């Protein structure tokens, strides 16, 4: 299928690792010129080596200064994928104000700052795609990291609110809700929540789904490419009828039918 994306421009935050890297590759393969911001030029170059149609920019969208630097270097884009995010399992009573502020700034304000600039321009051009990479945690708050769940819920609200402003235009704003996905850091996360003292990655994954995500129909980690393929379609002109949606790619974790 031709997604009709050739010649478009995209920004993918957090686009040099995990789900973000898979999204970068998927869009680039469709002929999109993808800009990937990051904190380290060396790490960006290493992660993006060999990918056609990609540009690395040293700027951290997780800070106000970094977002401003990115906007200065790339004033316009057709597609904005707000993928940047962090997470940390932590008992609720131990989550400090600093923890709350940090995760909110990275997970929520990074997308707010960039959308505040690029979204009005998309409306002016009468075409654009804003995509927030949220999580099933946005509607099924994980007790092991409540602060993370709050940020993912916030993304759902922001996305739907922006979509309401697109009425009658060719701009769409949607959210993707991945479930637990195989990416950098997931092995350590699974070990941290495991009851075993030193589980193998396979044991930790099995226990996680049995104890913490028992409603999953997939009963395994999702591969990053399985998320990226959905993002590529939602980025496409072919997805024009999908707007203001929270799209599930969580392996059937959520039991509701709507």
Residue ranges of predicted features:
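Active-site helix of classical SDR
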Residues: 115, 151, 159
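Short, small/polar-rich loop/turn modules that mediate ligand/substrate recognition or access, typified
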Residues: 167, 172, 242-244
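Alpha-helical segment proximal to the catalytic Tyr-Lys
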Residues: 120, 164-165, 240
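Substrate-binding pocket helix/loop in short-chain dehydrogenase/reductase
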Residues: 91-92, 99-104, 212
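Residue(s) in the substrate-gating loop at a strand-loop-helix junction
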Residues: 135
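Conserved glycine-rich cofactor-binding loop
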Residues: 9, 16-17
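Short C-terminal tail/terminal secondary-structure segment
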Residues: 140, 232, 243-258
């Amino acid at each position: 299928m031709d997604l009709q994306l050739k010649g478009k421009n995209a920004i993918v935050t957090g686009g040099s690792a995990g789900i973000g890297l898979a999204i970068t590759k998927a869009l680039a393969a469709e002929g999109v010129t993808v800009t990937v911001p990051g904190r380290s030029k060396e790490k960006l170059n290493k992660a993006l080596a060999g990918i056609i149609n990609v540009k690395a920019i040293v700027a951290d969208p997780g800070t106000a200064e970094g977002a401003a630097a990115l906007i200065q270097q790339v004033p316009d884009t057709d597609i904005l994928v707000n993928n940047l995010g962090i997470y940390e399992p932590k008992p609720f009573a131990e989550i400090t104000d600093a923890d709350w502020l940090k995760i909110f700034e990275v997970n929520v304000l990074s997308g707010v700052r960039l959308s505040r600039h690029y979204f009005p321009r998309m409306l002016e051009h009468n075409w654009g795609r804003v995509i927030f990479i949220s999580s099933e945690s946005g509607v099924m708050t994980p007790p092991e990291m409540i602060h993370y769940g709050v940020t993912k819920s916030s993304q759902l609200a922001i996305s739907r609110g922006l979509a309401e402003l697109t009425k009658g235009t060719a701009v769409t704003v949607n959210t993707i809700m991945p479930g637990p996905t195989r990416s950098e850091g997931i092995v350590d996360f699974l070990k941290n929540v495991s009851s075993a003292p030193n589980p193998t990655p396979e044991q930790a994954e099995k226990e996680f789904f049995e104890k913490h995500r028992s409603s999953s129909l997939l009963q395994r980690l999702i591969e990053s490419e399985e998320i990226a393929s959905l993002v590529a379609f939602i980025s496409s002109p072919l997805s024009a009828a999908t707007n203001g949606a929270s799209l599930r790619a969580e392996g059937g974790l959520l039991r509701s039918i709507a």
